[in-house]
Design a protein with these regions (language model features):
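Short gly/ser-rich loop at a beta-strand->alpha-helix junction or flexible surface loop bordering the NTP-binding
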Residues: 1-146, 263, 268-269
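Surface segments flanking catalytic/ligand-binding clefts of nucleic-acid enzymes
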Residues: 122-269
Length: 269
């Protein structure tokens, strides 16, 4: 069997494409006992949404606490963290905890990319951190790169989102001067029966909005569920708006659509 060396002193089948977890495990064979995964690598292991360029990056971020020397190896970006924090374990790998990882991303991300990542830490399913935990981490971080960007991102981030595209929809709507929609507002019909929990909603105007990825179009079962879901909202006298990638990629179109529906439902600009 032909072998490749992803890291010095480590061998793996040459024809295999190593997953991130496999790559991290391979590096652990030669890593120091005091090393742990951090920054982009930790965020990826946690499932935090990142730009494509970082999702595909093969270099690993490995850190140590001060006063240890940061690791130096081909394929590894070494870091030294000034303060000790309790580590997490993911897939039997030592990883920086979520709030510390978020602080570290301030040196890598900015703008909407950082807001989407922050929403990813605060997400509804498998929540990684609370707003209070991120606020505490920020208040106790000094002379760390990106603190100003982190402050700005946390101010625009929201808890309980489901996807980065949903985050972008919310940001586009709010920045256009429209009212900010609620997240995960639970809708009941006139008889008190559960209708649904849309991604975004204007409860005052009975408008429900869902972002639908490509799977909603290509999966017959999901598509049928979407049709029935729309009917439930309509029967409850709610206006149901379905948003797609085309809307997010064309912000003026998204804003015009939401603005039109708001006005139809009684909103005064």
């Amino acid at each position: 069997m032909d072998l490749a060396s992803p890291f010095r002193g480590v061998r793996a089948p040459a024809d295999s494409v190593l997953s991130l977890v496999d790559l991290c495990r391979a590096y652990r064979e030669r890593a120091g006992d005091n090393e742990f995964f951090s920054h982009v690598t930790a965020a990826r292991l946690m499932g935090v949404p990142l730009p494509f360029r970082l999702q595909r990056r093969r270099e690993l971020d490995s850190s140590v606490f001060h006063p240890n020397h940061p690791p130096q190896a081909a394929g590894v970006i070494g870091h030294r963290i000034s303060r000790g924090v309790p580590l997490r374990t993911i897939a039997e790998l030592p990883v920086a905890p979520p709030a510390e990882t978020w602080i570290q991303l301030g040196s890598v991300l900015s703008g909407d990319d950082l807001i989407m990542a922050t929403d990813g830490f605060l997400r509804r399913k498998f929540k990684l951190a609370t707003v209070e935990e991120l606020q505490w981490a920020l208040a106790n971080s000094f002379r760390r790169p990106g603190l100003r960007s982190l402050h700005a991102a946390l101010a625009e981030a929201r808890s309980n989102t489901d996807s980065p595209r949903e985050t972008l929809c919310r940001l586009i709507i709010r920045r256009a001067g429209l009212p900010e929609p609620s997240i995960r507002f639970t809708v009941y019909d006139q008889d008190g029966f559960f209708v649904g929990t849309p991604d975004l909603a204007y409860e005052e105007y009975k408008i429900a909005m869902d972002y639908e990825g490509d799977g909603h179009r290509t999966d017959d079962r999901v598509w049928q569920d979407d049709v029935e879901r729309a009917e439930l909202f309509q029967d409850a006298t709610w206006r149901y708006v379905r948003l797609t990638k085309d809307h997010v990629d064309n912000p003026p179109q998204l804003v015009a659509r939401v603005r039109k529906v708001l006005i139809q439902r009684g909103w005064k600009p």
